[in-house]
A protein has these predicted regions:
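Active-site-adjacent core segments of small-molecule enzymes
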Residues: 1-201
Length: 201
């Protein structure tokens, strides 16, 4: 059912079912790590990664209206594998919530990953012209592990045909719960199929 629903919406829009339009900018992720560690090298270790970041609005509503703000990040693991992280503005940590912008508001992974240290959320919050990335146990404090520096102003950037795969491209050591994968995978597959199909004539 999710596959068919997302395929129909994506075909009607000729775009992603959710977050149909966005702005893609390049950036640099400066990872300074965390202690105690989570068992995930991409979070615990230090490094500098070249990244792509896509900012988008969940329902695709016009700018003046509140919408769920999306922040999608493509980075690279210490072993060279792609790492995709999808974050959205939330009420608390787990409920998607519309906002007018990204300044001063939390973006969360919503679902907690499985990590060697236990369930782990990823989050981001604006920090100067960029963002601060952090991890947290579901009821624990946010612990910053990286700074995201953007090279361009997202308000002036164009979209790009990127497909983020947060389930397939999770950082080594992170894994989505099976219940979340069962929801995400047909939804993402349906959205891809709908975009390939395009609107009916």
């Amino acid at each position: 059912m999710l596959f068919d629903l997302f395929r129909a919406v994506a075909a009607a829009r000729a775009a992603k079912a959710l977050h149909p339009r966005g702005a893609v900018v390049a950036g640099t992720l400066v990872r300074h790590g965390t202690r105690p560690g989570t068992g995930v090298a991409w979070i615990d270790g230090t490094g500098v990664d070249e990244v792509l970041v896509r900012f988008s609005r969940g329902a695709g509503l016009p700018g003046p209206l509140p919408d769920v703000q999306g922040l999608a990040l493509r980075s690279t693991s210490p072993g060279g594998a792609p790492v995709d992280v999808l974050l959205a503005t939330t009420l608390g940590r787990r409920v998607p919530f519309p906002r007018r912008g990204t300044t001063g508001v939390l973006h969360s992974s919503i679902a907690a990953y499985r990590a060697p240290s236990g369930p782990l959320l990823l989050g981001a919050r604006s920090h100067g012209p960029g963002f601060l990335l952090a991890s947290a146990a579901p009821r624990g404090p946010w612990r910053p592990f990286a700074e995201l520096h953007l090279r361009d102003d997202p308000a002036r950037a164009q979209d790009a045909p990127l497909t983020f795969e947060p389930v397939l491209n999770a950082a080594p050591g992170l894994e989505f719960p099976s219940s979340w994968r069962r929801l995400r995978e047909p939804a993402y597959a349906g959205s891809r199929a709908g975009r390939a199909r395009g609107p009916a004539h």
